[in-house]
Amino acid sequence: MFYKIFGWYIILINVLGFFLMGRDKHLAKAHAWRIPERVLLSVAAAGGAFGSLLGMQIFRHKTKHRKFKVGVPLLLVLWIVLIMAGDHFLITTSRYKVTSEKLPEDFDGFTVVQLSDIHIVRSQFQYDEILRKVKKEKPDLIALTGDLVDAPGYSKSNGTNTELTVKLCGELAGIAPAYYIYGNHEMILLDDPEKNPFKVAVEEAGVKLLNVKAETIEKDGVTLNVCGLQDPSILYKDPVLSQYNDNKSRIEAELDIALAGLDTDNFTLVLSHRPELLDVYAEYPVDLVLSGHAHGGQFRLPVGRCGLIAPNQGWLPKYTSGTYRSSNGGTEMIVSRGLGESEIPVRFFNMPEIVSITIKR
C-alpha cells in the first residue's frame, strides 16, 4: 500500500512541477504576479524534479537561471539515486487472495509465502529482513521458485558465497514445509547434479527439492497437490527431457511426469520459474501457478504493472508482477518481482518483494 501511495505521490508532484513552470512562464509574459522561486525549487526538491525540468525545457523557462539550470537536474539525479537505493535495500510484502471451490474446507485460509530470484543472500541485513517478514506471515507452506543461486557469482566464488543462503533455507524449513524448484541460474548446479554441495546443503537444511515432482499435502483426511517444475532451459542435461527441442514441449513433458498419479480433482498448486508459459500450464488441471524470473521488468512506472524488459519476454513484457489469468480462464498465476538482481543489478520503482498468498474456498 505504501508503495502505491508513494507512486501516486511521485506522479502528482511531477505534474505539479510541470504545471507550475508553465504557469509561471505565462505570468512572466503577462507581467503579472509571479510564483516565488523558492516554491518552484521546493516542488522540485520534494520529488517533482522531472516534471520541473520537463517544464523548463518545453516552456523555455528558467533555463538561464543558474539555480534552476544546475539545481533542478541535480535534484532529479538525487531522487533517482534515492529511489534506486530503496529498491535495492528495502523489501516489501505483497499479499494476494486466491479463491477456489476445489479447495477443501479444512484448507480454507491456507497461506503460501513465495520467495523468488534471491540470487544468493548478499548481506546479513537482507537475511534478517527476509526472515522477519516471512515469520510475520505465519505461512503453512513456503515456495522457493528458482534462482536461489546466481550463476556468475557462484562460478567466481566456486560456490563459497552461499553460506547465508543455506542458513536461510534452514530457518525457512523450520517455519513451514519449504519446497524449492530450479530456475535458469541453477544450471550451474548441474555439472554434478546429485553431489553438488549447494544442493546437498539445502536439502540437509530441510528444504525439499521438487523438480518434476509432486507432493500431496494432507490435513484431516483431505488433500491438496503441490507440483514443481524446473526451468526448461536446463533440461538439456536431463536424459529423458533433453529430447524435446523447445520450452513448450519440455514443460508439457514435465507436467505429464509430475502430475501423473495425482488426483487432479484436488486443488493443484504448481511452482514454475517461467511466467511466459502460463497458457501451457493452463492446458493441464492446474489451479494456481507461482512464478518469477521477470524481476518485475527491472524498470517500472510509479504505478501500474508495466515493466521495461524481462528475460524470454523482451521489451515491455506481459508477465512481470502480480496476478494473471490464462486465456482459457482456468488457471491463475502470481508472478513475484523477486528479491535479488543478476545481470542487470539495478531496479527502478521495482522494490524486491516477498509474496504472501492466502487461498480461500
Model-derived features with residue positions:
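Lipid-exposed faces of alpha-helical membrane segments in multi-pass integral membrane proteins
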Residues: 8-19, 43, 74-78
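Hydrophobic, aromatic-rich membrane-embedded alpha-helical segments
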Residues: 39-57
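Acidic, histidine-bearing metal-coordination/catalytic regions of metal-dependent phosphoesterases
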Residues: 78-111
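Active-site metal-binding loops of divalent metal-dependent hydrolases
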Residues: 115-119, 146-148, 184-186, 213-214, ...
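Beta-strand-turn-beta hairpins that frame and shape the catalytic cleft
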Residues: 99-113, 207-208, 214-228, 263-264, ...
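Binuclear metal-dependent hydrolase catalytic cores centered on His/Asp/Glu-rich metal-binding motifs
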Residues: 196, 200, 204-207, 219-268, ...
